[in-house]
Amino acid sequence: MKLLFFLFGLIFAVEQEKPYLDNNRVPVEQILNDHSSAKFDYTYVSVCVNSTDETLLDIVYAKECKNAASRVALGKYSNQVNTTGWGILEIETFASHSYDVQAYGAGVAEGELTRLQIYYHYRNTIETMCNNHTLFCKRLYIYLQQNLDWMRSQVQANPPTDPFWRQVNLTFAQLTGIYDAYSKRNLTPEIGFDLHPIYMMQLAGDMFDLNKLLNKTADPMEYPEGGRCSGFVKLAPGNKDMFMAHVSMSSLSWMQRVLKIYKFGYDVNEVPGHIVTFSGYPGVLISTDDYTITSAGLTSIETTIAIFNQTLYTDKFMKPEGQVHCWIRSMISNLLSRTGKQWVDMFGRYNSGTYNNQWTVLDWKQFTPEKELPDKDVLWISEQTPGYYETRDMTWYLKKYTYFASYNIPFLPKVSEISGFDNKARQFAWFDWGGSPRARIFDRDHSKVTDIDSLTKLMRYNDYTHEEFARCKCTPNPYTGEGGISARGDLNTPGGTYEVESMGFRDHAGLDFKGTNYEMFKKMRFRAWGGPPYDPLPVFDWNHTNLTNVRHFGQPDVWNFTYVDLEWQLAAQVQLTPYDN
């Protein structure tokens, strides 16, 4: 019990100039895109090997260490939460150090630079999770500790050349670095498989299903059926461009956000995704939304699949040993995969039955502007339930329909059956693949997407009071704010009557937009827009909302921001052509 209380009481070659032009040349002022992240100021930290004790690392607020060779990691952070809704974090590690030390150093830089944001995120999401749920948290603590012990045993049992388990070890090295720096501990590069609040933050998605497995009493204000996200892949007319976008939808307490790039000094042949860029959260190693671009030329997104078949929540399908939680598997898949098929195959290992999603993985290497797509391996999906996992090449669909949309409903028939979605769809079109509001809006409006601006407009779309597909047999108003590509459940009527529980008033809305096209992807860039959709809807304002008792420490009151076009300071090289077999 002491450990339990400790766990949840802690608060992460320019052409040669012609001589006769020398006197006629004047410098031209560089004009930055007003939406570019390049205009922001950054705080820098270097993580350096201690000059007298090589078993310790030091944090230096500078771009360099006194001894250049001692620099393990460089971190850069710009806190723009009050101007854009985002923090921007860049982490680079250096190949002169071992992988373990690099991973730990990357965590140290993040834990130091984003300590305040980690604290706010902890308070908003983790601090109260055991309030009135003491018995549940006992069960959870035992389950998670058993899982951590099993993973540690597998790391020890498998050779260090095993790519999967090596990356598990590196993941926990990075996590340990965040925890140690955040907690202002001695920075000794070690790898801890420990339960602490920073670890709990990684489990945000996995907790949806662990809550059900371990019988946590449901919170009536939580979104009941996992309609967390909208995802979209689109070919421009004539295949002139390609787009991939995502909207995360969740509790509004989750709007403490960070845009990140990790650039590890790993061997690119061993770790093709050694650079990843993503939208995420303070102190969290993976996107969780998810929206991730990798240096191997892949982008992965997901939308959550609710499990209505409660018989799946048993130790037959979900157990602490023999399984690896979703957040770790997604991180490893991003780092190690060269192709979409490799990604979905890698992710399917050690299925934990937690954070059950439809993943969509796009291989940009297979795309050439104005050229016909190959017949295979451009777009892969995977779908998961407890005890079952299936993948499929969806290139044919993208070629035939020029788009693929993901909206929290399984595409694969067996997954639909196992999860219970097929029974739900027979009762309400809300749960029908192809027939739900977002499915019908995507099908109607996808052809309007021709550039990054029209992509942004579609993914932020919500005009529910005028949208025919948002209408419902509801009172007092015959429509729902959940009936848009980006939800506004906070605008529904408290105490209203809705056909389906998830149509109603909830602490649930679109939190963002992320999208990229081919030119942006080539530099691992994307556009990001923080906050719930507005115009024509009202701007979200914590001072003027019907939501009560929703934690939002460190958040701006008014979310009237516009988008940011990311321009990383770090050089980010991406694989642009298919790998040789």
UniProtKB/Swiss-Prot annotation:
UniProt EC number: 3.1.1.-
UniProt KW Endoplasmic reticulum keyword: no
Broadest EC class assigned to this enzyme: hydrolase
A Gene Ontology molecular function term of the record: phospholipase activity
Compartments, as annotated in UniProt: Secreted
GO terms for cellular component: extracellular region
Glycan attachment positions: N50, N82, N132, N169, N215, N309, N543, N546, N560
UniProt keyword list: Glycoprotein, Hydrolase, Lipid degradation, Lipid metabolism, Secreted, Signal
Principal location class: secreted
Signal peptide: 1-16
Pfam family, one: Phospholip_B
Domain of life: Eukaryota
Gene Ontology biological-process annotations: phospholipid catabolic process
Known role: Putative phospholipase.
Family, similarity comment: Belongs to the phospholipase B-like family.
UniProt-listed PANTHER family: PHOSPHOLIPASE B-LIKE 3-RELATED, PHOSPHOLIPASE B-RELATED
Protein name: Putative phospholipase B-like 3
Organism the protein comes from: Caenorhabditis elegans
